[in-house]
């Protein structure tokens, strides 16, 4: 599957785009996303709102599991927040641990720009047989 075609596919994730979340890197079973923290991302306590971290991790999960070409949707997701952040660039790195033909499983580590772990996100998906994330141009 072409990397640029996959990145283009995820440009249609309007929610992530509206929140400043970008897909930086994608390979088979792996993806990296980032967001530069702005005042709009902070909660009343002055820390990055948990929903921002969840969305960042969820996009990384989606990219990693869809990297094989078959449309994959999230079936379950869990996030554990371990540290707060209030500035800088936050990165989520997703690694597919189980590449099952219907039920993939992935771990996503969310870190700040100093490498501090902020959250761990795990999710399983469901691959929609016969539905493809992108259509390759064969000439």
Residue ranges and their predicted role:
Residues 1-139:
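Terminal targeting signals and extreme-terminal segments of soluble enzymes
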């Amino acid at each position: 599957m072409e990397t640029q075609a996959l990145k283009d596919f995820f440009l249609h994730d309007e929610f992530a785009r509206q929140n400043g979340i970008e897909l930086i890197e994608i390979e088979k079973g792996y993806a990296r996303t980032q967001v530069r923290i702005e005042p709009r991302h902070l909660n009343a306590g002055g820390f990055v709102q948990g929903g921002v971290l969840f969305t960042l991790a969820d996009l990384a999960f989606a990219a990693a599991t869809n990297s094989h070409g078959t449309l994959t949707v999230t079936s379950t997701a869990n996030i554990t927040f371990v540290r707060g952040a209030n500035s800088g660039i936050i990165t989520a790195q997703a690694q597919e641990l189980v590449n099952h033909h219907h039920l993939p499983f992935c771990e996503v580590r969310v870190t700040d720009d100093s490498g501090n772990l902020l959250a761990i996100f795990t999710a399983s998906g469901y691959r929609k047989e016969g539905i493809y994330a992108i259509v390759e141009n064969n000439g």
